[in-house]
Amino acid sequence: MISKLGKVFVFALLLVSLVFPVGAQSDTTAMDWENVDPSGQTVVFWHQHSGDREEELAKIVADFNASNEWGITVEAINQGSYDDIYNRMTVSLASGEALPNLVVAYANQSAVYYLLDGLVDINGLIDSEKWGLSDEDIADFFPGFYEGDVFPQYGGVRLGFPPNRSMEVMYYNIDWLAELRAAGAISFDGPPTTPEQFEEAACAASANPFSGATSDTPAVGYQLSYDASRYASWTFARGGDVFDAEANQYTLNSPEAVAAMEFLKGLYAKGCAGEVFERFEDQTNFGTGATLFTVGSSSGLPFYATAVSEGAGHQFSVAAVPHTTENPVQNIYGASVSIPRTTPEAELAAWLFVKYYTTADVQAAWGLASNYFPVRASSADALAEYIESNPAYKAAFELLPYTKAEPPVPGYDPVREEIARVMPLIFTGSDTRPVQEILDELNDFANAELEAASTF
C-alpha cells in the first residue's frame, strides 16, 4: 500500500510532467562555467535555522557580502521547518513559481527536486578550473560527508553540498556506570562497546537506581525513541544496512535489522529499557539521573549539558552505539545545500557562497555556533581549544572516520514515518508476530514507496 504522502508525491510528479519532462535533466556538468560571470547576482537562500544558528549564519552571509569580489549579495531567509521548505519547493517546481538560488535539503528531498528537473549537478562547478575546488580542498573534506550527496542511481550526479553534519551517538552517565562497576553489578569499565555489555549495564541500572538522581521517575537503563535513525543506527552497529544501493531496494528486513529489533524487544521484555512518550523525555530523564543511556544526535550535546546541569549534575559523555563489528559504524546525517536551476549566473553565484561557507575557518565558526560537526578535517585546528575543553564533543569528533548514511532516495520521508510506527509494535510486543514477518511487511511497504516515488 502506498502512503498518503507517496500518493501526493506521485500526483506532483504527474502535474510537473505536464509542464516539462520530469527527469529530463540537461547536461549541467558540461556547461562552460569558465565563461559565466556571477557579478552583481543576488542569491536567495532558503534555510530552517533559528536562534544562535541563524545569528551565526547572518554573520557568515554579511562577511561574504562585504568581502566577495563579484558584488554578490546573499539573502538568507528562514522558511520554517525542513518540511515547510520541502513543501514550498515542490509546489514552486510544480507551479512554475520563482525558486530560491540556494536551498537546504536532505538527500532524499534533493532527489525529488532532481526528478522534478529542479537542481544543478554541482560536479561541474567543483571540477571547474576557474571556480572549483582544488585536490587539496577536496581531500580536506571528511570522505563520508563529501560523498553523501552523490547519487549513483542517477549517474553520479551531485545534488547538494554539505555545510554540516551530525551523528547518532550513545549518551551515558559516567558516574552511574562507575557506581554499577564498584558494586559489582557490571563486569566492565567505561561505556559499553558491545550489545552484550549494553544489556548488562541497562539491566543493572534498572535494578540499581543512580544515587544522585533528582527525580522520582523509576530508573531504567535505556529509553528508546521511535525514529528511523534509531532503527538505522542499531542496524548499522550490527554490520547491516537498511538499503542496497546496487539493487536500489530497501533491506529493512535484513538479518542484522531483525537481530537489532529483537535485541531491543528483549531489553523491554526484561524491564531494562522503556519508551519515550514525550519529545525530549529521554533527555530530561537522562539529566535527572533516571535513565542511564539514550541514543540521539550529537547536535543535542548542549541540550543534554543543560538538562544535566539543571538535574543531577553528573558527569556524562558520548560513545559509539554498541556494535558487533570490529570498528564502530556511526549513522551520520544532516541537510546539505542544493542549487536550484535558475540561470547560470545565479547558479554560479550560489556556488561561490557555498564554497565560502565550507572553508575551514568559516566551518570552525559555524561548528562552534551550531554544535554541528564541521565538514573539513582542518577545521579541527581552529576548534582545538573547544574540542579539548569539551570531552563529550571530542569523543564524538573522534568517531567521524567511522560513518555511514541512511538512503538518499526519493520517498524516504513516508518510509521513515512507517518505521517509527512499526518500532513500538515490535519493542513492546504489541504485535505478536515474529520480528522477521513484521519487517518483511515493512520492507514491502518501503519498496512500494520507492517505486512510486521513482516512476510516473
Stretches with model-predicted labels:
Residues 63, 67-144, 179-180, 285, ...:
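Extracytoplasmic "Venus flytrap"/periplasmic binding protein-like
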